[in-house]
Regions:
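Outer-membrane beta-barrel transmembrane domain signature of Gram-negative proteins
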Residues: 221-241, 393-458, 487, 573-618, ...
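Structural preference for beta-rich elements and adjacent junctions enriched in aromatics
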Residues: 24-422, 431-432, 442
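Outer-membrane beta-barrel proteins
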Residues: 186-194, 226-241, 283-287, 326-330, ...
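Exposed, low-structure sequence patches enriched in small/polar residues
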Residues: 366, 458, 465-744
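Surface-exposed extracellular loop regions of Gram-negative outer-membrane beta-barrel proteins
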Residues: 242-290, 415-471, 532-535, 540-546, ...
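N-terminal secretory signal peptides that target proteins for export/translocation
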Residues: 1-5
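Bacterial N-terminal signal peptides
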Residues: 8-19
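Outer-envelope beta-barrel architecture signal
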Residues: 93-95, 137, 179, 196-200, ...
């Protein structure tokens, strides 16, 4: 134990030494002049968005030009090495932006053609707007040198949501002197209040890919927190009004499933189809209505396959467009709104002693309809209201008497979530989130909470957290608290301490997500980082953390520490490592409701290392190797991923992940006498994914993707747990033979 702690400590100390000389002070604030650019009104013909920049307005001698960009990377604070000039014009309908990106080596301009909203190894420019000028929210618009568009929303000053898709125009073109980008951003893409003359927050940035150089017009060092808080000012916008808009997005999906032959499906094949529509309508300049009928589940089917042997529910990311857009408003420390609950797989089962086998069971609950209203009102108040109705779902099954029957496995349900958030102080907010689930055969489930995120005036320190409650039956009310105090900025030193409390009655999983209740945890982390080139390093991050947790009975169920380091090298490769220690003695969930289980061996250790090559090359790869002890056994895992781009419009990706577990003691089942049955598990698991993409045009692509998972389980030494880390081996192994095998 002491030897391993010493090794880990020496490794972390060596990482700090390799990070370069320690600064004498951790200065976080600099005096800065806020830059300003004036937009020029188009009084004649508006620009044609083609990247040529030959429209009369772009040669107007009265244009106010934004120039003199500053490096954010690699040489922070230094002047740009390639000149960039930006101009802004506008008319009654839209904002127009032009970039002149001069390059001394135009033959090295990178132009990878990919699908919209996908990052690539390309030169690019970005326009970031804060129309409310609240220093908290906004939109960002990217154009690559290949003309590929990306966009997203910005919230809470620094957080981004790439799921937002605006209807705007952009084009890029290569010129002998470099390349140009041209924007048309209609006002209906933006949310702002009416005013005689507007002042918006704005920033422009550029990335020169072959130099890995990122420059900002309105510069702020990486040591200072904030994104929108450091924007410059866009002035001169007079006589413009927010525009209403209507978008209708119909869809049709067809698919086929091929599997094993069953009694219900004699040939193992099934053809499926689905249609629906999404609608977006601007109710006002700052409120938008989104509605959907039978939302697209096509993207949900791309969830990575998982074999979950733990006591915790698998969390899946949201992929449906209706639920993705604007989801940032519902993000709070406690996940009271987990949108994958809406339309989830049916959770009920057939309660019929005569049931023989299933003929048909829906994979998901049908959403009859859903609608939401989102926006930001005057005074800095953001609101979001969502309501969805799901259909009753039934399973068709065959009885032992040869009769076909149906049973309800998911009652009809109504889901509601209401969010309100108020800007306060300097780049801070307080808010509330409330949810309600009404479903036949269940008592209405109500949850709610108040959250906050408060910064000091200089943006260095912040205090954030949330208090929540839940009531899912007539009697028990649960509560929870999350609090975090952090040093959010600083050139070298950052860190935080945090506290989490979830009482035994806290139940938020009807519409939210939590891995457990009956839990109290305290912990913290510390990080030392560098961003100056030193020796072979460009950037380094060195972090250590420790957290301890107990249930309300006082049992020690979570005590873990970690040290990790990340090094970005001057050749743009990245390497790093992590070391973890787990010292808790008990688990109160492993027996699935049958008391405490003592870990066979404690403490346990794990560690790993990774390597990522320069993704700008045609061929790149990343790999990681991890190993450790766990549950009285050991394990190791390895991942290898490869990307190959033979041409700018052609890309192949492949990855393989292999995981091997030896002699790990795991819960298997509970017997009729409520005793937990355990066994030693040997597990081999391999997962694969492959994607091929061809871009025929920047707005037309063809993609083929596949993924798979194969797991082999071998349970041995089956035994009954009697407590105090002792077992009775009086189990007939043949009774559990079906648990072994290969699963895919």
């Amino acid at each position: 134990m002491q030897y391993r702690l010493g090794v880990a400590g020496c490794l972390f100390a060596l990482s700090l030494i390799l990070s370069g000389p320690v600064a004498a002070a951790d200065s976080t604030q600099t005096e800065r002049v806020v830059p300003e650019v004036r937009a020029t009104r188009v009084n004649s013909r508006s620009p044609v968005i083609d990247g040529n920049l030959d429209d009369p307005i772009w040669s107007d001698p009265g244009l106010d030009l934004a120039r003199n960009f500053t490096q954010r990377d690699p040489d922070e604070g230094e002047a740009e090495t390639e000149s960039t000039v930006v101009a802004v014009t506008y008319d009654d309908d839209a904002l127009y932006v032009a970039f002149w990106c001069y390059d001394s080596e135009p033959e090295k301009i990178r132009r990878q053609l990919v699908r919209r909203d996908r990052s690539s190894e390309s030169d690019l420019v970005v326009v970031r707007l804060d129309p409310y000028h609240d220093h908290q929210t906004g939109n960002q618009f990217y154009i690559s040198a290949a003309g590929v568009l990306m966009d997203g929303r910005i919230f809470d000053d620094t957080r981004t949501d790439g799921s937002w898709n605006g209807v705007w125009e952009g084009a890029a073109r290569i010129h002998p002197w470099g390349w140009a980008a041209e924007y048309r951003i209609p006002y209906h893409c933006l949310r702002f209040t009416e005013s005689g003359e507007h002042v918006w927050g704005v920033n422009f940035s550029r990335e020169v890919n072959h130099k890995e150089e990122v420059t900002w017009w309105s510069f702020a060092p990486a040591s200072e927190s904030g994104l929108t808080a450091h924007y410059g000012h866009l002035t001169g916008l007079k006589g413009i009004k927010p525009a209403t808009h209507l978008e209708i997005l119909p869809y049709a999906v067809s698919s086929a499933e091929i599997g094993n032959e069953t009694e219900a499906n004699r040939d193992g094949r099934e053809a499926l189809g689905n249609v629906g529509v999404d609608v977006k309508y601007g109710l006002a300049s700052n409120l938008t209505l989104d509605a959907t009928i039978n939302p697209d589940f096509g993207q949900v089917e791309l969830d990575a396959p998982v074999l979950n042997l733990s006591a915790f529910e698998t969390w899946f990311p949201e992929r449906r467009p209706f639920f993705i857009e604007g989801s940032d408003l519902y993000e709070t420390p406690f996940s009271l709104f987990y949108s994958r609950r809406v339309g989830r797989p049916p959770s009920g089962s057939v309660d019929d002693d005569l049931s023989d086998y299933t003929l048909d069971r829906p994979d998901a609950t049908s959403i009859l309809g859903a609608a939401k209203i989102t926006g930001k009102l005057s005074g800095g108040t953001s609101v979001a209201l969502l309501n969805a109705v799901t259909e009753e779902e039934s399973e068709t099954y065959m009885t032992t008497e040869g009769e076909t029957r149906e049973a309800v496995v998911e009652p009809i349900a109504n889901y509601s979530a209401f969010r309100i958030k108020q800007d306060v102080l300097q780049n801070s907010h307080v808010g509330g989130l409330f949810t309600l689930v009404s479903q036949d055969t269940y008592h209405p489930a109500v949850t709610g909470g108040v959250d906050w995120r408060l910064f000091t005036n200089n943006g260095v320190w912040n205090f954030s957290g949330q208090t929540v409650f839940s009531r899912v039956d007539k009697e028990d009310i649960g509560f929870g608290v999350s609090a975090n105090f952090a040093k959010a900025s600083g050139r070298h030193l950052r860190g935080a301490i945090d506290l989490t409390i979830k009482d035994p009655n806290l139940q938020i999983n009807r519409l939210g997500y939590t891995s457990r209740n009956d839990y109290r945890e305290i912990g913290g982390w510390f990080m030392y980082r560098t961003q100056d080139n030193w020796w072979i390093f460009r950037n380094t991050w060195n972090q250590c953390s420790f957290h301890s947790g107990w249930n309300y009975a006082g049992d020690d169920i979570y005590r873990r520490g970690n040290i990790n380091s990340y090094f970005e090298l001057t050749n743009f490769w990245s390497v790093g490592y992590s070391v973890n220690i787990q010292t808790e003695k008990y688990s109160d969930l492993e027996t699935r409701g049958n008391g405490l289980w003592e870990w066979p061996v404690h403490p346990t250790w794990s560690g790993g290392t990774f390597l990522i090559t320069d993704r700008r090359h045609k061929l790149s790869f990343d790999t990681n190797i991890n190993s450790g002890s766990d549950r009285g056994g050991s394990w190791w895992a390895n991942y290898v991923g490869v990307e190959y781009r033979p041409r700018s419009n052609l890309e192949f990706e492949a990855g393989a992940d292999y995981h091997r577990t030896f002699n790990g003691t795991r819960w298997l089942d509970n017997d009729d006498d409520d005793h937990a049955i355990f066994a030693d598990l040997d597990k081999d698991e391999i997962s694969l994914h492959l994607t091929a993409s061809v871009m025929l045009h920047r707005n037309l692509s063809w993609q083929l993707s596949g993924q798979g998972l194969i797991s082999t389980l071998d349970y041995r030494d089956i035994k009954r747990y009697t407590g105090d880390n002792t077992y009775v081996r009086d189990i007939n192994a043949e009774d559990y033979a079906d648990y072994n095998g290969t699963f895919s």
